[in-house]
A protein has these predicted regions:
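ATP-dependent helicase/translocase motor core
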Residues: 1-163, 168, 172-188, 205-209, ...
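SF2 helicase catalytic motif II
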Residues: 229-268
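Residues immediately C-terminal
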Residues: 173, 216, 245-246, 275-276
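Conserved motor-coupling elements within RecA-like helicase/translocase cores
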Residues: 196-210
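Carboxylate/His-rich catalytic cores and anion/metal-binding grooves
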Residues: 371-401
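Conserved helix-turn-beta segment of the N-terminal RecA-like "Helicase ATP-binding" lobe
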Residues: 172-196, 390-399
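Interdomain helical connector at the RecA1-RecA2 junction of SF1/SF2 helicase-like NTPases
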Residues: 280-372, 388
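Phosphate/oxyanion-binding active-site loops and adjacent basic polyanion-contact surfaces
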Residues: 111-119, 144-147, 346-358, 383
Length: 401
């Protein structure tokens, strides 16, 4: 990695220095320094052979060489950054406020990885410039919730935002976020429970960060609970949409109604897989991603495990047709037609297929490591319970222990 990273403050790296020996030219390592600088979102790249320096300024696009004793001080680099940013127009007061605000640190809070720092800095920077719709794409397992927390922390502490709504579609996502990554903000955090909160509206004002399930805000029969809880549509100035590809970007989604109600707020969409279809588009709503850290990036950097795809064909798969009189798991005769993989465990449940899949998984684990951590994705909870039982039966020898 880079030989030296120079920081303007704990949140902002400002320069990369690549060191070579005197047998190389002063600019020999400049391209390497520029590569690292682009990776870390750093604006000044330097190379040195011990006798002088070569500089590439990403803000102006210009390069120069200078003597070893002329290297700019931290204060000089910061002033250049402040004045040269935004195509020479300089940084705004809001940009300075978030740049100077450090990340949340503490005994149980690990420092951000380089790509998390990039994601946070890009996001808060875009918001400081006035961008109201922001898309952040990060591969699963790279710390999206931690990144969201650091974004919220810096925006709140810098004063740019005061009231935050964090939207998700599953309880476990909300509860884990509150209990883990957002724990440093627990005194100002509240999980919305419509049945309780509707009777204590005056107490909501004491919180800054609200977590909510879409279902709690929408209510039964599209009751629009969010209007009762928050009659002022300008109540929130920041809305974060977790896994925004699941529905918030769909034009006719009830979830979109929530976003439209709080339309004056800045909206941040976070996803590992931005959805782009005729009917649903993350990019058309949130805009092009301000930062992307892909699965490929994570594997290359060593933060994610590499994988290989093993395709297995089951006897009951695509273009399967039942035999005459064949019955499903409920004992009902299966309709005589062609079935595809998208039908199974949704439109039709066939126990033989579940057993076959469980056996294939078992065979693979027997050939590798039966004690290896394994995740099996299922259609729903009912399917998951059937698969659990099938796996237990296929591994009865292990279950006896």
């Amino acid at each position: 990695f880079a030989d030296y990273v120079l920081y303007a403050n704990k949140a902002t790296p400002i320069a990369i220095v690549e060191a070579k020996d005197a047998n190389h030219s002063v600019s020999h390592g400049l391209q390497q320094a520029m590569t690292y600088a682009q990776m870390l979102d750093v604006k000044f790249a330097y190379s040195s052979n011990g006798e002088g320096f070569a500089e590439h300024d990403f803000l102006t696009g210009k390069e120069r060489t200078f003597a070893i004793d002329e290297f700019p001080t931290k204060e000089e680099l910061i002033e250049r950054y402040k004045s040269e940013a935004n195509d020479g127009n300089g940084l705004t007061e809001q940009e300075l406020a978030v740049i100077e605000q450090p990340f949340c640190t503490g005994q149980n809070i690990f420092p951000p990885r380089y790509y998390q720092r990039n994601a946070v800095n890009r996001t808060v920077g875009a918001i400081a410039k006035g961008q109201n719709r922001v898309l952040l794409v990060m591969a699963t397992g790279t710390g999206k919730t931690y990144t969201a927390f650091q974004i919220v922390w810096r925006l709140l502490k810098s004063g740019l935002k005061k009231k935050v709504l964090y939207l998700a579609d599953r309880n476990i996502l909300v509860d884990q976020s509150i209990q883990q990554d957002f724990k440093p903000l627990d005194k100002v955090t509240h999980k919305i429970d419509y049945s309780k909160d509707k009777n204590h509206l005056e107490e909501l004002g004491s919180y800054q960060v609200f977590f909510a399930l879409y279902q709690q805000l929408i209510g039964q029969n599209d009751a629009k609970n969010y209007k009762e809880l928050f009659p002022n549509p300008d109540y929130f100035d920041l809305v974060i949409v977790d896994e925004c590809h699941r529905g918030s970007a769909k034009d006719d989604s009830n979830w979109r109604n929530i976003l439209e109600y709080f339309s004056s707020a800045t909206h941040i969409g976070m996803t590992a897989t931005p959805k782009e279809t005729k009917y649903q588009s993350s990019i058309s709503y949130f805009g092009e991603p301000v930062y992307t850290y892909s699965l490929k990036n994570g594997i290359e950097d060593g933060f994610l495990a590499p994988f290989k795809v093993i395709n297995i064909t089951t006897n009951i798969g695509d273009e399967w047709r039942p035999t005459k009189g064949q019955k499903d798991i409920n004992g009902n005769e299966i309709e005589d037609r062609i079935y595809n993989n998208s039908d199974y465990d949704y439109n039709i449940v066939i126990e033989d297929r579940i057993r076959e899949v469980a056996q294939e998984i078992t065979n693979y684990l027997k050939s590798t490591d039966r004690m290896a951590k394994t995740i099996v994705f299922c259609a729903d909870e009912t399917h998951a319970e059937r698969m659990r039982m099938a796996l237990a039966n296929a591994n009865a020898d292990m279950c006896k222990k």
